[in-house]
Amino acid sequence: LGVFSALLVSLIGTALALIAGYFGGTADKTICAVIDIAMAVPSLPLTMLLIAYLKSGMFSLILAISITAWTGTARILRTRVKQICELPYIKIEKAMGVSAPVIMVRHILPNLKDILLTRMALSVSGAMTTESGLSFLGLGTYGQKSWGNILHFAFFRNSILRKQIWWYLPPIICISVAVMGFMLVGYYGRQRRE
């Protein structure tokens, strides 16, 4: 679930960043305004609202998480696209009349690879945390096996009052290790890039 959400987040963020960074002007201002508005809305309540509105299922959960998580990727990639568009060879290609999609695919996207992989690793960890939280609250995919669902069922079977801590430890440890692993991969990619 986290990987599919990260792929969708990267797709949305990259598309909007390419449009805003390459074309600039009104498109850039509009997309930046949408990003600012989307970042101002708290993501967890919005995700909960989207899940309540959409049909229950794995695709709905992936879509709801992706709709609320693309803003950071779009903002970072937009800045990098604007920097790349100022390079001399991009200006020469524009002056020669090369079409925008060709320039984007041939020259800009390969230069975004490192940032995109780093953001994907961080997006996976964020999606895993969000899914676990939503499943714990009972808004995840019912019947699917997830660490959040294990926590949900343990909590609603009064495991705390019965002092059955072993119901909580395995999913908490697994969530922590998985999220920490993806975060470290993301931070390693960022350190390597700098």
For every predicted segment, state its role.
Residues 58, 67-68, 121, 164-194:
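C-terminal transmembrane helix and the adjacent membrane-cytosol boundary/short C-terminal tail
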Residues 52-53, 81, 130-170, 174:
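Glycine-rich helix-loop "coupling/hinge" segments at transmembrane-helix boundaries
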Residues 1-12, 101-133:
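Transmembrane alpha-helices
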Residues 27-34, 59, 63, 70, ...:
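Alpha-helical membrane-protein architecture signal
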Residues 3, 7-15, 19, 67, ...:
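Generic alpha-helical transmembrane segments of integral inner-membrane proteins
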Residues 48-49, 57-62, 66-69, 116-150:
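Non-cytoplasmic
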Residues 8, 12, 21-83:
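Generic hydrophobic transmembrane alpha-helix motif, especially the helices
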